[in-house]
Amino acid sequence: MTEKLFYEDSHRTEFTAKVISCEEAKDGYRVVLDQTVFFPEGGGQYADTGVLGTVNVTDVHEKDDVIYHYTTEPLEVGSIVTGKINWEERFEKMQQHTGEHIVSGIVHERFGYNNVGFHLGADYCTMDFDGTISKEQLKEIEAAANEAVYQDLEIEILYPSKDELKDMDYRSKIEIEGQVRIVKIPGYDVCACCAPHVKTTGEIGAVKLVSMANYKGGERITMLCGRRAMRDYEKKDAMTKEISALLCAKEYEVADAVGKLKDEQTRMKSQIAELQQKLLEFRVAEIPVEEKIVTVFDSALSGNLAREMMNRLLDKGAVICAVFAGTDTDGYRYVIGSRSEDVRPISKALNVAFEGRGGGKPEMVQGSVKGTGKAMKELLMQYK
């Protein structure tokens, strides 16, 4: 059994311990100490990292009350080592985890929903609830959670007896055997939890509920607390300032500026489409259709316009029409059609000769090819 020093003081970062065992493991070694500050993976929270002496600790697991430290190098059995956890990583995780307890407690109290899933990753934290939450309710939850932070409430850790536990109203996702550890945030939450937490709610700094999505009939909320929330704000603030400068708009008016830009883009697309149609009409009018196969190469045609040009030239009287959009450098997209001929052999010939892909029905084929327009025209001459 490993003595769990992280339960005595969640802010403790260094300790000394005796090496009980050291065994080879996948990608390193598995070390057992008589006591540790390293928290193993559990309760939805991933394990601490750090060092034992000069050896890196990459992961920590627990089984049958024994904590296993996975290291990059071996440690001598019986030796005394000094361990140190990555404090910034631990503190950030505690900020997220205690923030999750507050939010889950508020949701449970106000709406009666249970937290049915929790993931604390390296970059974000998600909570799954078994009921639906509106955008307005999400704002209310966030405001209430931050009110708990402002109150700087002391986090209470309780180890109730079985009799005390029977009379205690607390949240728990699973049935727990043995001693139950309760994390209590006065006025907000009482929950069974095995992970270390901050000492007061003020240490969380801030709670930001950044997104919400429907998930398995309920809601999945993504949250950032403390330092993570600050980094997220700094990144978004920098982006807002950059967009503000690009649009020559005040920071709090960038959404309106983007909306105007989008409207302008829609108008321009409409005007471009009208001009493309007029240009297409001029192009079709000047292309002769006396030959059996009419071939058109144009670098500016989109897929829809290429198909429309083909149909218009067929309407004009072309027996077979092949339209190529692209360049010798970038390759070509082609569409070939006919009202009376099977054009699939032409597609097959192009694909073989020019590393092409594509096909279709007897009356129309589409695809892409690589090569020069000159060489493609020479191949198509065979069908005149």
Language model segments and positions:
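A glycine- and charged-residue-rich anion-binding loop/surface
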Residues: 1-384
